[in-house]
A protein has these predicted regions:
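Juxtamembrane intracellular "pre-TM" segments in multi-pass secondary transporters
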Residues: 2-13, 202-232
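Helix-loop boundary and gating motifs at the non-cytosolic
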Residues: 6-64, 226-263
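Central cavity-lining transmembrane alpha-helices of secondary-active solute carriers
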Residues: 54-72, 265-278
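Conserved MFS/SLC helix-loop-helix module at the cytosolic interface between two early adjacent transmembrane helices
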Residues: 65-102, 282-288
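Cytoplasmic helix-loop-helix junction between adjacent transmembrane helices
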Residues: 110-151, 335
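C-terminal membrane-cytosol helix-exit motif in multi-pass small-molecule transporters
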Residues: 165, 187-207, 390-398
Length: 399
């Protein structure tokens, strides 16, 4: 069948556009804060890297428990929208509490609440997105959604950068007052996102599981290819620590807080421009090829982070890091939809996202310890090795 990607946007289900707009607004809010949190912890509160890794790991791993059961619950109810909106709302409610943060434990509590909200919404949202797209549009739909997500991150970073420039001018490290102003500004797009999703998204019919045929969390329930893919993703994720360490590496190599914002905007611009086209490409040439290319680029970029000597090198490498994200993020979710029946997708996405989240705790803790007790290059070498191993297993196991 001849592919005509230029005509696809006009034929996409309206849900895909509303979910994309909601994610865009959410990321405007979230990215104003998320990438400043490690700098707030390190520069303002004086927290060590091992604790920063622990905070990121605990937040993601705790949310993983919610991801499993929210996905299973959405399968049992045959309804996705309610859980999706509830998750976005909880994350919105948690954000203002960062304004009062004075200890790392306080930050952990807010991060925990925010990630629980993400855990509630992610699996049913992905199932809703998959159910709203035709099979031959699925990669494109996920790519468009991720592109909107990342475009929101780009604008959010731009707003954060403007606030930093206006409030602390030439000061190179983040200050408390600046962070508090960013927190207040982030609330507006978060509230708008919840309204867009609540009013715009419509439920998509899905087969409701009967009481004697409820989706289970047992491993053997799923196809061998899905199980193999999850195992390979876990191996990769163990070396894919929080991006907080890349941000700190940039500062370690001389980038100011405004330059770090610029670096992050470069990453998001690259990702936003490529996510849609590469998602569409995966519909034609296959998901595994793009995943392998993405993980290979990741390994080379992480090796570059380890060997870099200047902030400019970190900035350039972070642009290539955006290519890795565009090649893998939406494509991985489309691959899950390809190999799992529709009535199990909520549960499958819950397990898939949970596997990543559970791996995030040891990944970030290991990275923090390697940074603190060996050297700042060590976590990146570790990540590069595991990414290349995962790429090999993707080719040999997931067939």
């Amino acid at each position: 069948m001849t592919s005509q990607p230029q005509s696809r946007p006009s034929r996409l289900h309206p849900n895909i556009w509303f979910l994309t707009i909601g994610s865009l607004l959410t990321d405007v809010s979230s990215e104003m804060l998320t990438n400043l949190i490690p700098l707030f912890l390190y520069n303002v509160l004086g927290v060590q890297t091992s604790i920063i890794g622990l905070i990121d790991g605990i937040a993601e791993t705790t949310a993983s428990l919610v991801k499993i059961y929210s996905g299973a619950l959405s399968d049992r109810l045959g309804k996705r929208k309610m859980l999706t909106v509830a998750g976005y709302a909880l994350s919105t409610i948690s954000k203002p509490f960062l304004y009062m943060a004075v200890t790392w434990e306080w930050v952990l509590g807010v991060r925990f609440s925010d990630r629980v909200g993400k855990g509630i919404r992610t699996a049913p949202r992905d199932a809703l997105l998959a159910g709203s797209a035709k099979t031959d549009q699925r990669g494109f739909a996920f790519g468009i959604h991720r592109a909107g997500d990342t475009a929101g991150a780009f604008f959010g970073l731009g707003i954060a950068g403007l606030i930093i420039w206006l409030t602390q001018a030439g000061v190179t490290v983040l200050e408390r007052h600046t962070f508090q102003v960013v927190v207040l500004a982030s609330i507006i797009p978060a509230v708008l996102a919840v309204l867009v999703l609540a009013l715009g998204v419509k439920e998509v019919d899905a087969e409701r599981q009967s009481n004697h045929n409820l989706p289970t969390l047992r491993w053997k329930t799923f196809d061998r290819r899905f199980r193999a893919f999850v195992i390979v993703v876990i191996i990769f994720t163990l070396g894919n620590s929080s991006d907080s360490f890349i941000i700190l590496r940039g500062q370690n190599r001389g980038l100011s807080v405004l330059q770090i914002i610029g670096m992050l905007m470069t990453f998001n611009a690259v990702y936003a421009l490529l996510a849609g086209p590469l998602g569409s490409l995966s519909d034609r040439i296959g998901r595994r090829k793009l995943m392998l290319a993405g993980w290979t680029i990741y390994g080379l970029v992480y090796l570059g982070f380890a060997l870099s000597h200047t902030g400019a090198e970190i900035w350039m490498l972070f642009g290539f890091y955006g290519i890795y994200y565009a090649l893998t993020e939406g494509v991985a979710k489309a691959l899950v939809a390809d190999i799992v029946p529709q009535e199990q997708r909520g549960t499958a996405y819950g397990l898939f996202n949970a596997a990543i989240g559970f791996s995030a705790l040891p990944a970030s803790v290991i990275a923090g310890v390697l940074w603190q007790y060996i050297n700042p290059a060590a976590p990146f070498i570790f990540g590069a090795v595991l990414s290349l191993l995962a790429g090999f297993l993707l080719v040999t196991w997931v067939r």
